[in-house]
Structure formats: structure tokens, C-alpha cells
Amino acid sequence: MAKPNPEELVDLGMLSYDKQDFSKARKYFEKACGLNNGGGCGSLGMLYEYGQGVEKNLTKAAQFYSKACDLNNSVGCGSLGMLYEYGQGVEKNLTKAAYFYSKACKLGFQKTCEILKEK
């Protein structure tokens, strides 16, 4: 059997997510994240942030967003910035929030560029 393609795993996870099958989505995202796919890690963080298919856990969300950001996933960086801005799952730290918003903006996440302009 061919080695799973992380991008395909994320796509399968998103299809499951769209069908509200969060448990199945989580499995795909976990596999993709394990293969160092930033989109998989970021999507896994989202499931934990909102308690979809898993028990809500903002600390775990922050860990997955952090890994996603390390893998240059713009949404992971932006989401991590938001957790730092509001002290959710991590200790509130506006300096770190600005850093992650800035990294997300540089990676093309337009919403974070707008957040930075408002600060």
C-alpha cells in the first residue's frame, strides 16, 4: 500500500468535517499532523478549540496550533495568536500574540494583517 499523502489526509478530514463526522475528521487530521502537515495540525487544533469530536481542551488546541505554526501554517499561527491575546489555553501574552499574528500575516493570512493594523 502506498504511503498516505498528508494533503490527501487533510482533504479527507475536511470532507468528514463538512459532513459533521468530527470523529472521522480527527483521525485523518491526526495522521496528517503526524506526517508534519501544518494543515492537519491546525485542523486538529480547531477541533480541540471548539470541542468537535473531542472534549474541548484549549491547552491541546494551543499545542496543535503551535506545531501547525512551526510548519508555517498561517491559520495555525493566527489561531495561536488569538489564544495568546485572550489567554485561552495559554497564559495571556500580548507580545506573543503580536508575534504569531505577524507570522500569520507574512504567511498570507489576511485577517491577521487587519488585526495588527487595529492594534
Each language-model region and where it sits:
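Terminal, low-structured helical/coil segments at or just beyond the last alpha-helical repeat
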Residues: 2, 105-119
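Hydrophobic face of amphipathic alpha-helices that form TPR/SEL1-like repeat modules
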Residues: 9-18, 43-50, 79-86, 115-119
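Repeat-mediated protein-protein interaction surfaces in helical alpha-solenoids
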Residues: 1, 23-28
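Defense-system signaling and execution modules centered on TIR/cGAS-STING-like, death/scaffold domains
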Residues: 1-3, 12
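Alpha-helical solenoid scaffolds that mediate protein-protein interactions
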Residues: 32, 68, 104-105, 119
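Short helix-capping/linker turns of helical repeat alpha-solenoids
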Residues: 4-5, 16-17, 21, 34-38, ...
